[in-house]
Amino acid sequence: KPGSLKALNCRVGKSRMENFCRQEEINFEICGKVIVAISEDELPALETIYQRGRTNGVRCEIISLEKLHELEPHVAGIQAVHVPEAGIVDFSQVSERFAERVREREGNKILCSTKVTGIRQTSRIIIETEKGEFEGRYLVNCAGLYSDKITAMTQTPGAKIIPFRGEYYKVRPGKNHLCRNLIYPVPDPNFPFLGVHFTRMINGSLECGPNAVLAFAREGYTRSTVNILELADILSYPGFMKLAAKYWKAGAGEMWRSFSKAAFVRALQRLIPEINADDLEPAPAGIRAQAVMDSGK
């Protein structure tokens, strides 16, 4: 939403990311994206996206079907928002370069596979780990799937992390021409996720997805990965129960697409009718660390 911290982070962070990539000679591309309305009932939501973008200072425009097909010839739809300044980058390269810059400064350390066991606060913040104690003026919590555990160690009330697995398919090279850049649907206002979309990667490959299904473990990157204790903790959390009650219908659809490739393909065909099941091969899944308050928000 305009004025939110997320909006500020997107706008300022994008500019700083581009500058960092230029300085570090990391390959990136400003390729643009389209957000496509498939039917008349999606036009009000598309207009809202456009107005929010303009309010946030994002260069964007509503384009006709003719203009849309100039940008993405294989897309179905009746209208779209074009965001020409959207871009792509290999974030593993970005992370590796950040790590290099951190290590270059005297006294800095990066400790991988190191468990935090406690946090104390006096005049400074003391982090207790399996490899000793570390102290500083500030603690930046970037623990992802375990960020709520870190927050709890500071005795600060906060949200619980609910893990949602996002499953992807990679489009076979012979069909990469179906998507030139980035193609998104109009998000369902009744569901807190974006919906399946097409993403061209910086190496030229094309991926589609993700869906959004409850993972049965914090690191449940596959359907067969189950952690009974973590799952019980999720299912007994009041915030999750309220979230599930509100979005159960959409969630059931997401779960069905997880088990049915045909259903996944049908969702993709709303954007690109020419895509079919034979064009897709499984790609690695990701886990979204969704912060959920007791209220279900």
Where are these predicted regions, by residue range?
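Glycine-rich active-site loop/strand segments that organize a redox cofactor
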Residues: 1-13, 24-28, 215-250
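Flavin (FAD/FMN) cofactor-binding core of flavoprotein oxidoreductases
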Residues: 66-69, 161-164, 170, 174, ...
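Flavin-dependent oxidoreductases
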Residues: 119-227
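General small-molecule cofactor/ligand-binding pocket signal
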Residues: 61-63, 109-111, 281
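Short beta-strand to alpha-helix junction loop
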Residues: 2-12, 36-46, 81-100, 111, ...
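A short, glycine/Asx- and small/polar-enriched loop/turn
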Residues: 41-45, 71-78, 120-126, 134, ...
